[in-house]
Amino acid sequence: MSESPFIFRGKRNYVLAADVLDAVLFDFYGSSKTRDLDYLVKYPCTTQGYRLLERASATQLEEMQAMAQLRDENHNVLVMPAGNPVTERCDCTETGMAAYFTYDRQNPEKPIVHVSQLLTETPFSRTCVAAFKYLLNTCVVQEPRQYLFARLRLKTTDISCFSIQFQRIFGKTFFEGSILIQGQPCGQIFFGGKTA
């Protein structure tokens, strides 16, 4: 089991699943860099720690209880909640991150947010999630929404500058974006969202 300093950031808890992903990757590799990543958030994290189970040996009940599942070039695991509930909340660093975001609205149907660099000590996953939320709020959605980070698929997480292009909305509550490196597709990000 890993006890990590998970805390809620800002008023919403949507970014915590990205912090869990970065923590798991750091436990595996000593950094958040990997390849062929598919990370699916099954429900929001509410605990200060997690434990990992190999999916191949997991029971059906454990599959249902997992807060996320992660597959990459070396692992296929369930991320299980563990430890005490998260009780601490801090200011969100989104405002500082936004200084590194620029928008391209040339195609109003599929606007793009460009991220020029990762903030110091801000992992890729959290930056990616914050950038997609900013894109949705700035260029796509006209009403206040509560978002939940739902899925991240990437060929590589060894990324410092990237873009996210809005792709589509499913059923008015599910949002898809394409992650681009130098204009070439590298992955996808998905959010769930409901009217605030």
Predicted regions, residues:
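Generic serine detector
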Residues: 2-4, 31-32, 57, 111, ...
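HotDog/MaoC-like acyl-thioester-processing domains
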Residues: 45-101, 167-196
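Catalytic strand-loop segment that frames the active site of acyl-thioester-processing enzymes
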Residues: 1-14, 83-125, 135
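Hydrophobic beta-strand-centered segment that forms part of the acyl-chain substrate-binding groove
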Residues: 25-61, 66-68, 129-168, 172, ...
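Short amphipathic alpha-helical face segments that pack within enzyme cores
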Residues: 19-26, 121-130
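N-terminal ordered "arm"
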Residues: 1-41
